[in-house]
Amino acid sequence: MAVLSLSNAHLAFGHVALLDGAAFSLESGERLGLIGRNGAGKSSLLKIVAGLEKPDDGLLQLTQGLRICYVPQEPLFDAAASVFDIVSEGVAEAKSVRSAYEEHAPGVDLDALQTRIEALDAWNWEQRVDTTLHQLHLDGERRVGELSGGMKKRVALAQALVAVPDVLLLDEPTNHLDLDSIAWLEELLRGFKGSVMLITHDRAFLDNVATRIIELDRGIIRSYPGNFSAYEKSKEDQLAAEAQASARADKLLAQEEVWIRKGVEARRTRSVARIQRLEVLRAQRQARRESLGQVRLEVDTGAPSGKIVAELRDVSMRFGEKVLVSGFNATILRGDKVGLIGPNGAGKTTLLKLILGELEPTAGTVRRGSKLEVAYFDQMRSVLDLDATLADTISPGSEWVEVGGARKHVMSYLNDFLFSPERANSPVRTLSGGERNRVLLARLFALPANVLVLDEPTNDLDIDTLELLEELLQNYAGTVFLVSHDRRFLDNVVTSTIAWEGDESPGLWREYEGGYEEWRTQRARAQKLREQAARIVPSDKAKPAAAPAPAAAPVAKPRKLSYKEQRELDELPKRITALEAEQKAINELLADPDAYVKDPQRMAQANKRHAQIDEELLAALERWEALGAK
């Protein structure tokens, strides 16, 4: 059953039509993911559904009594207010009705108020707020001004949830959230009993949350059942069909144009209906809105750096009593694509500054490579002068930029990033969040750099631009450091991941091969290895030194092992010890930066053997545990 529907909606700003006969419905209990290009009108559509804006034409129908709550992309709160007071605004009607009842104002119908109080559960609004704060791990007594962007997002969600809405509208809910918070939000939304409509460019989030995707494209809404992965398959088929249909229509139009030019005689001998048909074809082609242009990304890689970008040995960093990095070891080589993941405030930026020489460690050593030319992408956009034009931002004092050794006019370069010449002369302050990120990317890629540092580059970028950025970074010859909470982006770009694991020990960071999913798999495997290794030690110590193992084994086992199994059990501790020793030796070899230069073939074999040892060690420990349980 549809709880709301929008039909034949039209909305335009100037000559740009954002909605052009758009229509969709939202079913009870479904989670709708709204996607589309930056500037396509997604936020405007969400505000229309929320009742904050009105379309130029069209009809929005809601079921009677439908409660809708809208959480904007950047919630604005009174910085001096407490979290409890802000969240309580979500039950403003319940508070007002109960206050009116308690004040017994003259002429007030107390029976009607009592009925309304019970309908709103107004007697218990404080408990509802407290319960919601507890569920979202928020401290009601804290001032909002003290909170991070991610915690402010939680406050906005709490304010919406405490109202018990039938429909929850979310605009970019994952912005400013770390990976743990995103996983928490996914679980919360999957358990939400009402309907959800959200805008996000986080493809993994859409895969895990959405039950249907709707795409706003050239003013029209198209619906795709399933999550984002299902949408990708359907979209590919749809675009192929559209291309074939357009080609057929253009061919037919060309044939009719040839006929109409044959002259008066042809028009006398042919049906007037054919002329009318041609006019219809011309009108259809003029009305057909072509797909928007694609961002074209190029990057100036500058002169190559040395083979080693940075070598860190037992590096630690603390600020007072707070330990951000403890005993970290890593070797970063030219061409590595390194992802840094961890919760907000864990020290990702601090670790990056240590690697790049902007901070000196309180302990340990950092050896940095030669000829490093570093370019930064700033997630807070602090490098942008809001009063400067786009052209001056990209190329101050010049009409030309140099990219990849070739000169290019700044207007042409900005056009590659979908900025028209008129837009190129506009001040930065007139741009949306996504457009400002595109300007930052344009500026970043115009710099001659062999090391790129990207801090949350995916915020506000549409999916098409994200995919093109992924392709560019994959083919980039220099070194990339990427701080991101976009799991799909990490998986598609990075070759290794430096992950915060401070929940085990303060300031602990570990390096893993591969992206986010590989990190999750390897971390789970390593955790299992550590747990099993911890169990084997007390077992060995418990055995009397002089007691022969075969004689002791049958007493401890419910079923006697076979001779072959007993021999295997006796040999397994030796094999495990040997594998651990080999693993340690290979780790020491891999940590030697000079070895990569002296014998790259040997290092490739060592890397391969390192992965094999993990598998063999895990298998040996599991077998030892299985035999020991018999």
Predicted regions and their residues:
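ABC ATP-binding cassette signature C-motif
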Residues: M1-A247, G293, L297-K630
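Intracellular alpha-helical coupling/juxtamembrane segments of multi-pass membrane proteins
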Residues: S234-R277, L281-R288
